């Protein structure tokens, strides 16, 4: 298994994988990451200062990823942990922890002091992982994510 930064040539394979995982998880197609236009161009979306997307690769295939970027329409120091999804074949191996650590370290290096995340009620394993890393539930959405169907909001001080 290898963790690396996303490359332009990853876009097609990554978009297909992310949509497959979202369908498997029963995520609505409207008001979630499923309909994000940037899902088809992850490289371009995260190819800017203060943004980074990491890929998990195993046997020369993309098995998941996670990104960090400034939260749209929020203060300069607030970032969002974004599009953290993994193929079922690699879940339960501690990869989520590795990816959160990579993303949060990048956020700290880039002077963010709060990290926000949205998730779905049925993604209990993900919520437990976020809690383990110090995220706390909040009662309101932040920023302009376009994810009106995501009713679980969490925040962490960095």
Features from the language model and the residues they span:
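Extreme N-terminal starter segment of soluble prokaryotic enzymes
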Residues: 1-3
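Acetyl-CoA-dependent GNAT
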Residues: 5-82, 87-89, 100-102, 106, ...
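C-terminal "cap" of GNAT-fold acetyltransferases
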Residues: 20, 113-116, 120-158
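Active-site acidic-Proline motif in GNAT/NAT acetyltransferases
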Residues: 87-93, 121-122
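Short coil/turn segments at alpha/beta junctions that flank glycine-rich nucleotide-binding fingerprints
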Residues: 93, 109-113
